[in-house]
């Protein structure tokens, strides 16, 4: 009953209600666009495209786009070009002084970085759109799916539409972030993944029931394992290391002032401070080796064949793919944590507010101490994150599970769903608490103030 009362409180806050409605509206627009087939494509021929993109790397890419990839939709590129552009810009920020300067300029610098990311997104789209169109005949089993034929007009117009679709999806994500609730880009990916989940489960259910007498028991075991992985993912996202902080309280007595010890508070340092971004970044990079191996200049060479065999098609359940994937997640976790947890700023803010960590001097020593703690908790956090990410490959080896359904047993799909859902709930929770209502994620009683 308390949860229902909390949901009612959400609609009592006008600003929060408007933000939620805007978010839902923009997500519906995105889902509608994912169903619109490119002009010139015969929709009746899309069955073979869907069957060739229901598992492996293409299956994951299709999940990221909410099924738009398999529908030859105007949103077939999804939001991944924007993610790729963000990765490139952040990596370049390490080596390029101009970008380093922008990162230190606060809001104005971030605005310029966003503009650079947008232009780079367009450039990536101009490369990916022709590649996607060129791959359609093979993915459709060689059928003549183009109603207008494979003419130059079709290719030119389709490239323009695909690039525009990606830009529009990017705009939707930014609007959700600015005017809605949650991180817009992550929400678009999460909604796309959720949209493909029922079909994957239905295929697994049909396969399990039709092939063995213990099919229902197998499905129940899979569901139990699935919920256990969700629980582990939630624990990873929510786990924090609390650092005690003491504040000096200044009081006046006669002609002099003195400091007395104030109340003790805590700085919550998250075990996984980088959230789901290392997973998204690593997954975006894992699409690259297979594409490189398939280039004309490499596809007949030993290197090209090895890249395609280990990083293309259904290789995402293979050994080399998951070793590289796990290592990339660990590296990106450290990289993104360094960006999102500014220990220098935390130490300066603590010093200015009269706070200090017991036994640690304010200023530089505090910053170094926080850096040390973050390094200690980021290692197990990143390893745990990597283990959950590669778990689909493990469960495929242990149990006879459909590859499309296995993607939801940990891995990128589940971690994105859990991480984004918790992040969105926390943002809604902060709105409720600021207005003195019980939060969605708060267990204690928090009465509304008059």
Please place each PLM-identified region on the residue numbering:
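N-terminal cationic and glycine-rich segments that engage phosphates or anionic surfaces
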Residues: 1-103, 108-450
